[in-house]
UniProtKB/Swiss-Prot annotation:
The lineage of its organism: Eukaryota, Fungi, Dikarya, Ascomycota, Pezizomycotina. InterPro entries: CRIB_dom (IPR000095), CRIB_dom_sf (IPR036936), Kinase-like_dom_sf (IPR011009), PAK3-like (IPR051931), PAK_BD (IPR033923), Prot_kinase_dom (IPR000719), Protein_kinase_ATP_BS (IPR017441), Ser/Thr_kinase_AS (IPR008271). Residues 223-236 form the CRIB domain. This is Serine/threonine-protein kinase ste20. Its EC number is 2.7.11.1.
Amino acid sequence: MSNDGFSSLKFRRTSSKLQKDPPSVSSRILRSQQSNTSLKRHPSAPVHPRSSVTGSREHSRTRSNAYGSSSSSLEQHSGGPSPVLAGGDSNNSFSSKSRPGRFSFNTDPSSDELTGSPFDSRGMLSALEENTAESEKSPPPQPPTLRSYHTSPDSRGLRQSASFTALQNRMDTFTQKSENDQSTNTKRHSDEANGTKVFGRSKKSSFSSFVNSMLGSPRGIKISAPENPVHVTHVGYDNQTGQFTGLPKEWQRLLQENGISKKEQEEHPQTMVDIMRFYEKNARGDDEVWHKFDHAYAHHQPTANTPGSQRNSPPTSPRFPQNHEGSFENPRAPPPIPRGAPAATQAMSPPIGGLVPSRAPPKPPAPANMIPARPAPQPPVARPPQDAYANQFSTPPISESEPLPSEAQRSRSNSKTNGAQPQWAQPGAIASPAQYQQQQEQAMAAAQQAIVQNQLERSRSQRQQQSRGPEPKQPTQMGHSQHANDHTTALQSPQKAQPVPAARPRQRARQSNAVDVRARLLAICTPGDPTKLYYNLNKIGQGASGGVYTAYQHGTNNCVAIKQMNLDLQPKKELIINEILVMKDSKHKNIVNFLDSYLHGLDLWVVMEYMEGGSLTDVVTFNIMTEGQIAAVCRETLNGLQHLHSKGVIHRDIKSDNILLSLDGNIKLTDFGFCAQINDSQNKRNTMVGTPYWMAPEVVTRKEYGRKVDIWSLGIMAIEMIEGEPPYLTESPLRALYLIATNGTPTIKDEHNLSPVFRDFLHLALKVDPEKRASAHDLLMHPFMSLCSPLTHLAPLVKAARLSRAQEKAQKGGA
């Protein structure tokens, strides 16, 4: 075939194929070509993507695209003569150069050598088949192997649109580097670079990414997986299966050991969830209420090596030796001691059944991270009967959280009766009492110093983080905390060498507020040296945070009670301020009189009225009270509560331990550490505080509550005066919470022996629905108040309790 014939044939082929495309589109595309390259032969070029360049743009295509099967491909009629494969070489590559005109042919000498060559269609098809097979065997890494070779004219027109040219140039730079590594310098017409549909999606993705980066369009935020996740126990209830979900094995054992059967769990699933959530929060947390549970099991523990601490008679004062400062000032051990508790329950309670000589102090019942160290309980030395009262003051009402070294002798478990300090008269129980006491004092001093040092270092570290320049107050106030300089100096270097261990947020908050609390106390307290105002201090109680003393005031010779508290050992110092302010503002005949307060060195001295008769717990433990005497106690307590409620204060811990008596029978409320302020804007609380056996159902179930919780506790205290103990005292604390929440109003033994008016009084005070429960004012108007005996009729009960306590201590001493 001649050259003219070949040209005419090619022209006819080109024209026939161009008729399939819209003429306007093809014309626009062909006119946009700017490449001036010519067809070049590459004899041994490997199979790889080819690059189509339009100006500065490149586009990678696979070799197999050279002559696709699609009749619409421009590659078959790109305007150049059809090359002929020499010798059927399948590895040859073909390149063409764009031309300025639509139908202009290349006149470059390099293309002339192909002109006039015979058209070998069979060889060309063979080469195409071999190249296609080879491309399928080893496809290039990028882009992926193309399986469709159809080219859309519209797509080409869009890409070559003038409005997209600038963006396209920028877009191609993102992929140019990777494509250059895999492409050759072979050049084609720019319109031959059109991708297939598969490749179009890739280009579209790149184009969208580029436009988003240029226009600042928001991309989907990529959230990484959590790092170092900590699983928090979540307990639920499946209504379909009737089973708890996510209940830890420890909780399952705890429920079983506390006598809560699966049937009971299924009958009251929501109650169980509420109680267990409360336990989860408080068992490891800052709430002293849970640590009050300690004494509920203390009487189960065998008192090893302390034979004198064993009970000789049921009425023995419950509070005796469990002088554990973090313990639950819980109930005295009831006269009938529960014996059926499994051994596992004992594991729940701290090993404090008795003070074991020559042994390190027991670990606290709560997790170790709650308190850095806890001082060993110091055995009380033989003291006069005023102990009962002293122990009341040694209570740390100040902290509603942490096993606040609840100054050991506060509750019936340790505060009131002679039994509360069985070690007083136990010289025979220990070979050398002096050595034993010395060991305990040394252990206590070491533990207290460790706590102080740890807190001082954390305070110093916290202040350094908050501000590099020390505030004027801080050096002065922290200077008071430098009483253990030798120890803190030794501690500073290791503390600086390694970062301070991350404390819980609550602890950091307490440390950051320590200086402010001290500053507020300085504003509240009376300046001066209390040691010059009071003399003849006689220690009548000891707690981890300080001691309780009786003293006489210079000038008046009035006997007062002084509670000394080491501020550095108080977990929640702000509660001290709360207690002082409540007592200052609560001048009433039925509230223990607050006399004064002083900051003396590291200690806070709180001076109060001394109630030498002790607590009501002693009276109910050793005596049987008449309805008239019970009515008198209820009336005086209600008067004090009405005064508090009128000032927007909820006591939240009404029980016999916190009712003090004088030798004349006068009755006063004490222990305002759990008090809460309520007002018009916040007239409800939902914090679970108090002593569980006296808690109202709405407190146990963690509903909102108000003043009526004190009325429920008063009703329980009335039952306590009838039976000698509150309901469920023989049950484990967890089961007691369950029973309070599910049973509602407790049953009273021999209720038929009570007068109808007394039963009605109890019925109104123990309504489960707080809205239906009577108020303090309502109960003061109740007919039961007409039965009140004179307060002087209580004096014999106080004296009898003191005598019984003295006898009990004598028995312990002679054992």
